[in-house]
């Protein structure tokens, strides 16, 4: 509301960017990783296939989230959650999102591996439980989502560094959404 002026415009977009990233990406995906681990290791009564990979993914997600938040809070990456080109953010903004996504991908791979371990060790009989099936569906969707994000965020990172001179904003919007 322009007449209310709760925040100045620059602080509004800073808060909106941080809120969008933290609530729509960080919180939801950390929760999804927890669901994947629960649906595989706990519900199936199996061990995690690669605990070190799972912890590595967690720390990468945490590092990426922290890096992106610092870039936003420094004030040079208030591009809102969608971060549309041609609005340029700090390279650390894009690098943080990429690291976060790689960490999530490691978590998804650990989930798939845990399903294989559970099947090999016969920790369950018949088909997988419904909750685990739902988590499997979410994990498959996550792989495709992360791949689409990489397709557009890696060139955007290179553009923000200056290694690529132009990114088509329409292509960015189509791939992002």
Predicted stretch roles:
Residues 1-177:
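Membrane-embedded and interfacial regions of multi-pass energy-transducing membrane proteins
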């Amino acid at each position: 509301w322009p007449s209310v002026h709760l925040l100045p415009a620059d602080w509004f977009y800073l808060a909106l960017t941080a809120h969008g990233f933290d609530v729509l990406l960080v919180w939801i995906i950390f929760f999804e990783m927890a669901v994947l681990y629960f649906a595989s290791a706990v519900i199936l009564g199996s061990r995690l296939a690669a605990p070190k990979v799972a912890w590595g993914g967690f720390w990468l997600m945490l590092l990426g989230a922290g890096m992106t938040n610092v870039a936003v809070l420094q004030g040079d990456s208030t591009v809102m959650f969608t971060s549309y080109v041609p609005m340029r953010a700090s390279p650390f903004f894009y690098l943080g999102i990429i690291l976060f996504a790689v960490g999530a991908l490691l978590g998804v791979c650990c989930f798939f591996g845990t399903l294989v371990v559970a099947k090999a060790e016969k920790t369950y009989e018949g088909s997988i439980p419904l909750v685990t099936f739902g988590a499997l569906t979410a994990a498959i969707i996550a792989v495709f989502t992360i791949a689409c994000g990489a397709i557009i965020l890696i060139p955007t990172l290179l553009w923000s560094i200056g290694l690529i001179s132009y990114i088509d904003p329409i292509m960015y919007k189509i791939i992002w959404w």
